[in-house]
Amino acid sequence: MTPSLSNFLSSLVWGGLIVVVPATIGLILISQTDRLDRKL
């Protein structure tokens, strides 16, 4: 694997983490604080 390719892949991984982790934390916090009655 070339250095530029490994840099590209690692930047993709870190970019995905930077997007996914805060979104997941935000969804968990919203679902914890939002106490509406959701009956399926």
Swiss-Prot record:
A cellular component term from Gene Ontology for this protein is:
plasma membrane-derived thylakoid membrane
Where is it mainly found? membrane
List where the protein spans the membrane: 10-30
Tell me the compartments it is located in.
Answer: Cellular thylakoid membrane
Q: Which Gene3D superfamilies match?
A: Single helix bin (1.20.5.510)
Q: Which UniProt keywords apply?
A: Membrane, Photosynthesis, Photosystem II, Thylakoid, Transmembrane, Transmembrane helix
GO BP term (any one): photosynthesis
Membrane topology for this entry? Single-pass membrane protein
Q: How does it assemble?
A: PSII is composed of 1 copy each of membrane proteins PsbA, PsbB, PsbC, PsbD, PsbE, PsbF, PsbH, PsbI, PsbJ, PsbK, PsbL, PsbM, PsbT, PsbX, PsbY, PsbZ, Psb30/Ycf12, peripheral proteins PsbO, CyanoQ (PsbQ), PsbU, PsbV and a large number of cofactors. It forms dimeric complexes.
Question: Which family is it part of?
Answer: Belongs to the PsbX family. Type 1 subfamily.
Query: What is this protein's function?
Result: Involved in the binding and/or turnover of quinones at the Q(B) site of photosystem II (PSII). PSII is a light-driven water plastoquinone oxidoreductase, using light energy to abstract electrons from H(2)O, generating a proton gradient subsequently used for ATP formation.
What is this protein's record name?
Answer: Photosystem II reaction center protein X
Q: Which organism is it from?
A: Parasynechococcus marenigrum (strain WH8102)
